[in-house]
Each structure stands twice: as structure tokens, then as C-alpha cells.
């Protein structure tokens, strides 16, 4: 059976990996997953990521911990294949009053809610991370 929502699967792997205190997790790679991993790395929620080439490219994410506690407290899918959620620049949400981030897919690429607001862009809200 094919996977219905690969992004939700990615977020679940991150959540489960940190719950099990894994050093790194791997998953099938895609352009959107790499873009999301890049935003998470920029914002300091994951240590790093790399693409392992092969017959099927794999995305390997190195998870980040602070004092043996996961840096990612919660990671939640917002827009999903059955119900896409789009917001204009002035409607972009602040996650935990600005302490968390919303990952937004815009016409200029995947970025945080802060970067999208600064660029004056709206888009699809992929997930919330806190």
C-alpha cells in the first residue's frame, strides 16, 4: 500500500526518534522533505541532515537534544492532503506566542512564518514546531 501523507510520516519519524532517544533517523527523500529539514536545521530544531544517494535516495536527519531532552517539544502537521490550509501574510499564525515556528510553503520556497511575514508572502501551512 502506498503512503498517503509522506510529510506526516516524516514528522512522526522525528517525533518517535526523539522519544526513543535516537541519534539519527532516515526516511525516503523528496524535495519538500529536504526543504523542511533545511528549515528545521536553520532554526536549530535538528542538528543536521544529509541525503544518502543510492537506488532510492534517503534523507538522514541527525536529531538534537539539550540536557538529554529533545529540542523538539511538539511537531504537528497542519495542512494535509485531505484538507489543505492556506493563509495570507497577515493571517500567518504565531506558534506559542512566537516561541515556536510554523513551516510555510510559499511561492518563493519553504520557510518559517517569520521569514514569510518579512517577505510579505502567504502560503500553505505545512506544520507547527515548538
Swiss-Prot record:
Disulfide bonds: none annotated. The keyword RNA-binding applies. It comes from Actinobacillus pleuropneumoniae serotype 5b (strain L20). One of its GO terms (molecular function) is structural constituent of ribosome. One of its GO terms (biological process) is translation. Keywords: Ribonucleoprotein, Ribosomal protein, RNA-binding, rRNA-binding. InterPro entries: Ribosomal_uS8, Ribosomal_uS8_CS, Ribosomal_uS8_sf. The gene is rpsH. Belongs to the universal ribosomal protein uS8 family. One of its GO terms (cellular component) is ribonucleoprotein complex. The keyword RNA-binding applies. This is Small ribosomal subunit protein uS8. One of the primary rRNA binding proteins, it binds directly to 16S rRNA central domain where it helps coordinate assembly of the platform of the 30S subunit.
